[in-house]
A protein has these predicted regions:
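Accessory "access/gating" subregions that flank catalytic or transport cores
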Residues: 1-70, 121-124
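Catalytic phosphate/nucleotide-handling subdomain of diverse soluble enzymes
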Residues: 43-125
Length: 126
């Protein structure tokens, strides 16, 4: 099956994001309109990178855009959150949201992160 180049679409999404860093709503709409935010990899992966570029990597801004863009928001928001979360750790996440996630899902994110770090052979940050 023929499909568009994901790497070229990532570059285009990042270009759109960088061009609209001063207006995240416009960035969100442009990325959704030009790139798309659907389930297919050639839309969802570039969209995630476009939101990250637009928001300058700020976790919550990236997530707000990914969630509010429409279409397959859970997929795009998960990728956006994974990428920015891995890059910045938890320092940019609201403690209120972390507590809510733990409470609603009945697990401990911090403990899970420590276990993943241990498996990877890393020393978790305090």
């Amino acid at each position: 099956m023929a499909a568009s180049s994901i790497s070229k679409r990532i570059a285009l999404a990042a270009e759109i994001g960088l061009a609209h860093q001063d207006d995240l709503h416009v960035a969100m709409e442009e990325i959704a309109d030009v790139i798309g935010c659907g389930l297919f990899a050639h839309e969802s992966i570039p969209a995630a990178f476009g939101y990250i570029a637009a928001a300058r990597g700020r976790v919550m801004d990236c997530l707000y855009m990914a969630i509010n863009a429409g279409d397959d928001t859970d997929t795009v928001a998960c990728m956006t959150g994974f990428i920015t979360g891995a890059h910045c750790s938890s320092r940019d996440l609201s403690p209120r949201y972390l507590a809510l996630i733990d409470e609603v899902n009945h697990f401990d994110l911090k403990e899970m992160a420590c276990q993943i770090d241990a498996i990877a052979g890393n020393t978790p940050e305090a």
